[in-house]
């Protein structure tokens, strides 16, 4: 979880900012000016309020900036049970906003020739890193039957190259964390983590966890910054 957080914030959003593209509001790390609230009010009341309000601001012509130097502190989930409720809420909220707002972002992006709005639609639509890895593995297994086929044989090698690229990016994330050794040890949980995370995404896509916000208790007494 720490690795994907570093990749999302320290690499993806920071990279978007460096080339002039916009970020998204990210829960604990949101910072809004009073003039924004006076002009737009607060219109997001779903379980994915950060995604929802991000889209409302973008469609309203506002800019969302990512500050790579900012740090937020929060108590992270301590086990799979706590994390399941939290991740299901996040996934369900994102899919709800995706279903109702992606087309509006793309349409306005085309009408206004705004690459940034179209990129924001892609950000909302794209699977998370763990889902990308799971789907790439499924592609590799499924394309195994095509090895040696003169026409479809390339699909296996394409899937293998995709997995290698995702794995390399993940390794970059490991060595970008504050405790690379601990992150490396966590690799033993990957065979459990990927199916668990993909299940969360599928349930979120079906609408589970969308009715109640419901923050879960944290057993740890210390706070750790999970977003940078």
Q: Where are the language model's segments positioned?
A:
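Catalytic donor-sugar/metal-binding loop of nucleotide-sugar-dependent glycosyltransferases
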Residues: 45, 54-73
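Alpha-helical membrane-protein architecture signal
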Residues: 80, 84, 114-121, 188
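Nucleotide-sugar-dependent glycosyltransferase catalytic core
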Residues: 76-92, 182-184
């Amino acid at each position: 979880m720490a690795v994907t957080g570093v990749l999302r914030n320290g690499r993806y959003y920071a990279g978007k900012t460096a080339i002039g593209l916009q970020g998204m509001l990210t829960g604990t790390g949101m910072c809004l000016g009073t003039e924004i609230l006076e002009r737009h009010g607060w219109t997001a009341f779903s379980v994915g309020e950060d995604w929802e309000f991000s889209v409302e601001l973008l469609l309203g012509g506002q800019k969302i900036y990512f500050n790579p130097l900012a740090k937020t502190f929060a108590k992270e989930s301590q086990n799979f049970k706590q994390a399941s409720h939290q991740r299901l809420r996040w996934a369900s909220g994102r899919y709800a906003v995706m279903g109702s707002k992606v087309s509006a972002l793309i349409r306005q992006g085309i009408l206004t020739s705004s690459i940034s709005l179209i990129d924001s639609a892609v950000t909302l639509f794209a699977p998370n890193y763990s889902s990308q890895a799971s789907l790439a593995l499924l592609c590799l297994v499924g394309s195994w039957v095509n090895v040696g086929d003169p026409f479809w044989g390339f699909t296996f090698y394409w899937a293998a190259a995709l997995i290698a690229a995702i794995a390399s990016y993940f390794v970059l994330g490991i060595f970008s964390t504050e405790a690379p050794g601990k992150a490396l040890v966590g690799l033993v949980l990957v065979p459990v983590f990927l199916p668990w995370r993909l299940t969360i995404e599928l349930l979120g896509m079906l609408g589970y966890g969308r009715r109640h916000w419901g923050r879960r208790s944290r057993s740890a007494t210390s706070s750790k910054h999970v977003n940078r």
